Amino acid sequence: MKTYQFKPYNVGRWVIWSLFAIVLIFAPLVFTSNLSGTMLAQMGIAIIACLSYNILLGQGGMLSFGHAVYTGLGSFVAIHALNAITAGTSSIPVSLLPLIGGFAGIGFAVLLGYVTTKKSGTPFAMITLGVAELVFAMSLMFSEFFGGEAGISGNRVAGQTVWGISFGPQIQVYYLIAIYTFICVALMYAFTQTPLGRILNAVRDNPERVEFI
């Protein structure tokens, strides 16, 4: 009869994740100024962006100079979706806008990544740099989408409120970002434990051997 063995319960890992959640929950209650709230929200966004880049460079060993392109393009899609909600042409809840931006970023990454991943090493880095410069040049030409030098602004207090949450108070925006930050960090960690995540480590350490596997 076949028996299954499970990994031992990792107490330290649960402690770290619990502390991470506690910090996210209580940070705005400790740092209560408007500046602190803005900085905490931006830190949550930066955590997601930096850890995703760590998967690319730290786990896969691929130096990219165009990683911010996908974050930026996804953000522009999200702000256009927010303006559509404000105009009444869309009924998407504001709380789902980060998902829209995230999936838009994935779409652009698949489209541009199909070209950039044809090479590796220094050629890969130079291609990603070229993609970043191309998108920068496009931002000046397509002002309808990018908003030109002024960018695009929106009103986050739009659409129907859910459970009385309007995202008018800054703390509500922070907790929305904190929830997405925790979920994204957990998903990225889980990805590194999958076979595909392990293959990224192998590609980083010995790409020639991986080609023969």
Regions found by a protein language model. Give the residues of each.
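Transmembrane alpha-helices and adjacent helix-loop boundaries
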Residues: 1-213
